[in-house]
Amino acid sequence: MQPCYYIIESQTSAKLPASIREATAADFERTAREHWQTDWRTDFIQDALLEKYALELDTTKELVGLAAYRDMPKGVLVYVEYMESAPSGNPTLSKTRKYAGIGAALLAFGIQLPIDYGYGGAIYLKAKTTQLREHYMRNYGAIPFSRFDPFLLLIDGDAARELFGRYLKEV
């Protein structure tokens, strides 16, 4: 079994094959030039301890998402520091999204990282809004991780296996 990432074309519901690779300085420049919600050139995101990855369509190499992950070996998990869809797939920036499933693919890759590190597949993240918190809980099985911060969520166990499993294929 091997991860085979994809996103969904909103108009046709077709699964479009996508790849995840290390993000580059050119990717970060595009976030400013193409008016992404966040400028990925900031010191916060450019923290050397963050692993930054880009999600792009296999056929066109169109950049559709970026994510920054923090390896947390003492906690035996990975923290999803930040992730974002390109404007064409970001519901905050586009009334009609060209693509869906970008966040799911980036979260699944986040689960792949601790598996690759030998930890299992636990990730945690902080939802930016109540709406996103409910979305992560409803669609990805996230559970509250802290009684002090209801926006801090954990995706582990069956929920992590189910989400990552969506992208596994025999090759």
Question: Where are the regions that the model predicts?
Answer:
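Non-catalytic substrate-recognition and accessory regions of acyl/acetyltransferase enzymes
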Residues: M1-R97, A105, Q112-Y124, K128-Q131, ...
